[in-house]
Amino acid sequence: MMKIGDRFKDKTTGKIFIIRTEMGNDTLYLEGENGLGRRLTGKKSLNQTCEKLEDIKS
């Protein structure tokens, strides 16, 4: 299950993206962890190109 605020790491570039908003049923708006590098992607595409990073728990 994907939700706003989830972090994903691109498998090819190593960049970390955060889900900022969801548009429609399948489109996600991602923003780079440092505030740069925005992109739109589908949920299916995100699962193929990125891996979800688990939240840090103390």
Describe each region flagged by the PLM.
Residues G32-S58:
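Intrinsically disordered, low-complexity, charged/polar segments
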Residues I4-G42:
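Basic/aromatic-rich interaction segments and small domains that mediate binding to polyanionic partners
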